Amino acid sequence: MTVYLEDLQVGMSASLTHTVTEHDIELFGQATGDRNPVHFDEEFAKKTIFRGRVAHGALLVGYVSAVIGNQLPGPGTIFGGAAMEFKAPLRLGDTVTVTCTVRSIEGRKVTLDCISRVGETV
């Protein structure tokens, strides 16, 4: 689905829900070359502030990109930049929901607020 610029309205939103799998983490590590053991080695990860394996932060950013590129506004959209804050780690087995909402439209520039949730944790 593509929402054309002239059809966008402040408050419109779209979401994606995905459960993070071992396969997701492995493919992301292969694609990016990020083999940080905090993502792959449980014994190593237990000794970190995370106390266990976590998904790549950029994997979560990829889910945001999927909402923007596939749903709102959709195909043809250029993801021009982002300011992000990670409040909690994303873990193997977590089901995350990413919701993007149109905050403002200025000419051809659209600003979205995107929030990810795992259960009740934002």
What are these regions (language model features)?
Residues 1-77:
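Hot-dog-fold acyl-thioester-processing enzymes
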Residues 1-10, 89-122:
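HotDog/MaoC-like acyl-thioester-processing domains
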Residues 15-19, 85, 101:
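Generic structural detector for well-ordered beta-strands
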Residues 33-34, 45-47, 79-80, 97-98, ...:
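Short, charged/polar low-complexity linear motifs in solvent-exposed/disordered segments
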Residues 38-39, 50, 63, 78-79, ...:
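Short, intrinsically disordered/low-complexity patches at protein termini
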Residues 68-98:
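Mid-chain, well-packed structural core segment of small domains
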